[in-house]
Structure formats: structure tokens, C-alpha cells
Amino acid sequence: NGEKAVTEPKLLTKTSFPASVSPLLGSICWDQSAPYNNTCPLYQGERCVTGCVATAMAMILKYHEYPVKGKGTHSYKAPNGIECSFDYGNTTFDWNNMLPQYSGTYTAEQSDAVAQLMSACGVAVDMQYSPYSSGAYSYQVGQALIDYFGYDGNLELVYRQYFTSAEWMNLIKSEINEKRPIYYFGSSDDGGHAFVFDGYD
């Protein structure tokens, strides 16, 4: 399932790929502040940012423009007291009104569409919201996509440490050549960041 990490490399038989793949996301380039966080909770009077985990998820969902509607509901209370909930089953995602970028002018419908998606992603992974840095655990992303967004139950979380460098690059190139942008997370002693792999050269 989406929570279980793959600890044994699959046999990847394809080793020949195109020299480069242009970014699958095209011009989609989203951020964590307004308008993306317009429906994120307030904390001590300040609007919280979306968090990199939610932003990375949202860009991939926009790429697929799936689902039309979510599934179920989810709610939680964060350690800082913020209570969050989202009704996925009664939410229709307005893909057509989501812009690739939000620089310049845009309508209320366009800002509402992307803000709704960002909130849906954040709540699905129990985002710990704050005005300056919102965080969530990446291991929750896979199961959230399955449970609330209806993605394939065979979706997998894989860890770099269980693969050789060649196997890892092979896996990344395989996914990208199948036109599947990759949710990716990296961390060090100083912190971590989630982002999207959508091409290579």
C-alpha cells in the first residue's frame, strides 16, 4: 500500500532511455503563499502557508487533472491547536480554472480553485500548519492519494537507500518516460524539502 516502503528493488529490465525529457509539468509552477494558501487555516491571526508537501502533491494532481471528485472525509487536530477537516466526497475539483502560474491578474474562481486543491492535499497528510513553515511527513502522501483522491492502490513509496545509483536513475527515468511526474523528498540534518521530478537532460 501507499504507506509501505519498497525495500527490495524491482527488476528493471529497461536500461535505454531518451537522452532528455522536457518537463512534464510544462509551465505549472506553484508556490506556498497567496493565492495558494487562501483557504489554509489562520494561526494567531496570520494565514498559514501550504507546505512543500501539499504544493508538490497539488502540482502532480493538476498534471493528471484527476480526480473530478475526492473520496471520504478527514479531520485532525495539530499539536499547536489548529483543527483541520476536509470533505473530499463532496468536493469537485475545478481543474479548468487552475492556472499554470499565478503571477499577475486572475479571477476569484481561479484563485479559489487552486486554494481548494492545496487545502485538500494538506489536510490529507495531516499538515502541521504555521504561517512561516508548514510541514508533513512524506510517507503519508501515497496513502493519502489512494484514500482521498482515488489513485491506484499499487502506488508505491520507495527509498533511495535500497537501490544502487544505476537502479535509482533507471527507476526515475522509467517513471518520467511513462509520463508520471515523481513526488520526491530529500532531507538532511538541517531539514527537508518536497519537490517534483518531471524531466531530465
Which role does the model predict for each range below?
Residues Q143-D201:
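Active-site-adjacent substructure of cysteine-protease-like catalytic cores
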Residues N1-S134, S138, S188:
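Active-site-adjacent structural segments surrounding the nucleophilic cysteine of cysteine proteases
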